[in-house]
A protein has these predicted regions:
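Phosphate/nucleotide-binding beta-alpha loop and adjacent structural elements of enzyme active sites
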Residues: 1-230
């Protein structure tokens, strides 16, 4: 298969209005894979007022903050990672604090930086962000997207927002059935390996041949499922 030609990077903002026009304000099922403290959860709840937003966060520090802050009944929070297996797996916890106002950072991250943890071992991330430490691992619950969705979202998935720190390949490989009934997806990508096994954007598109690029940003991509018939 010949690699698809990638469009140029667009320096635009993915706004609520853009997503509503594309996905539809009447979207009913939204997945947020990598929810952190819930900032994007709030945005998704606002953007899609009729949707149930299913959010996944395996880091217990971030999960606790999300659980405390997000009270909307349409928000469903799961303390597990979406990955390439069903069961438990090693999760690499991030730590440290980035450059910036120390007092404010300590208030926001009292237990350390909880935003870069991954099922994938950090590689280039260590050199690119030397302040971010990975000194410990924990065991977390993991489900493949197909396994989770077969029980909790068996119909159309309107939109997936994925921030998986290098595990996007596992999402695509072990979520093919769920992705076949997913209309739109927004996810991070990196063309330099920051985590072990992290796919480039070109490789990610090879794993998801039905999806085309709507907007390519410097580190994120908005995708449309061209084969979706629902």
């Amino acid at each position: 298969m010949m690699p698809r030609e990638l469009p140029p990077v667009a320096h635009i903002e993915i706004t609520a209005a853009l997503l509503q026009n594309l996905v539809g304000a009447d979207a009913s099922t939204v997945l947020e894979i990598g929810a952190h403290h819930g900032d994007h959860t709030l945005g998704l709840l606002h953007t899609f007022p009729r949707a149930t937003v299913h959010s996944f966060e395996p880091d217990p520090r971030a999960f606790a903050v999300h659980q405390r802050l997000i009270r909307d009944k349409r928000s469903k929070l799961y303390q597990l990672a979406i990955g390439g297996t069903n069961g438990r797996a090693e999760f690499h916890m991030s730590d440290g604090l980035p450059p910036g106002p120390v007092d404010a950072l300590k208030r926001n991250y009292p237990k350390g930086w909880d935003q870069s943890g991954s099922l994938c071992a950090p590689t280039g991330h260590v050199e690119k962000h030397p302040w971010c430490k990975f000194t410990r691992t924990i065991s977390v619950e993991v489900r493949t997207l197909d396994t989770w969705a077969s029980k909790h979202a068996p119909g159309t998935i309107d939109f997936i927002w994925a921030d998986m720190q290098g595990a996007e390949g596992a999402l695509a490989t072990h979520g093919a059935q769920a992705l076949a009934r997913t209309r739109f997806m927004y996810c991070e990508y990196s063309n330099e390996e920051l985590y072990a096994g992290e796919p480039t954007l070109e490789r990610l598109l090879e794993l998801m041949p039905a999806f085309e690029i709507v907007h390519r940003l410097p580190d994120d991509v908005l995708l449309r499922n061209t084969a979706f018939a629902g």
